[in-house]
Amino acid sequence: KEFPGISITNSNVEAATGADIVILAVKPWFMEPVMRELKLKSKQILISVAAGISFEELAHYVVAPEMAMFRLIPNTAISELESMTLVAARNTNDEQDKFILRLFSEMGTVMLIPEDKIAAATALTSCGIAYVLKYVQAAMQAGIEMGLRPKDAMQMIAQSLKGAAALIQNNDTHPSVEIDKVTTPGGITIKGINELEHNGFTSAIIKAMKASK
């Protein structure tokens, strides 16, 4: 076998039987029939990747509602091992929490948060990645209009975003601190920032995030 110790099956029941950890990565509307079919045991750990399905709802679908449960919300950057993955836990202990966080940290950054913060955090991470890409798209259009080739413009913007993220992550600084370093009096950057604000940039971002909650 190419991957010794790994079994593949088309049967959900067969896959879950005897498993220590069961990961349910199905659409929310499939969750109830799949859960009813599985009849998970209290000693198993359930991980749900279905958005919008609360622990309370999951508890209704399982035979043992006291079982350890995790809700996981990754974003599409998981395909590049750069996901910002949100994790909420119920009926778990420290050892289980640490194991799950370590497991999914292989695919990016993980953060354990209370379940009641999941909706707000999802707006920033899962939805937010689309808003960042929308900025990339708009900036590319500006670059093309100013005479740059599309591929060059995209590379410039993507690397600039990567660098901006590194500045605040590696130095633990606030974005405003890094912005101040670039905005010299009467310079081109402050003119551009003022133009963004005159056109409601900050307000639009806040409204988009709140609309996605």
Label each residue range with its predicted role.
Residues 7-12, 111-113:
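Short acidic-hydrophobic, aromatic-tinged amphipathic segments that line or gate anion-handling sites
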Residues 124:
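Alpha-helical membrane segments and immediately flanking helix-loop junctions
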Residues 15, 31, 149-156, 178, ...:
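Small-residue helix-packing motif on alpha-helices
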Residues 3, 11-87:
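Rossmann-like NAD(P)(H) cofactor-binding subdomain of soluble oxidoreductases
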Residues 158-213:
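NAD(P)-dependent Rossmann-like dehydrogenase/reductase catalytic/cofactor-binding core
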Residues 57-68, 84-121, 131-172:
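Internal alpha-helical scaffold of NAD(P)-dependent oxidoreductase catalytic cores
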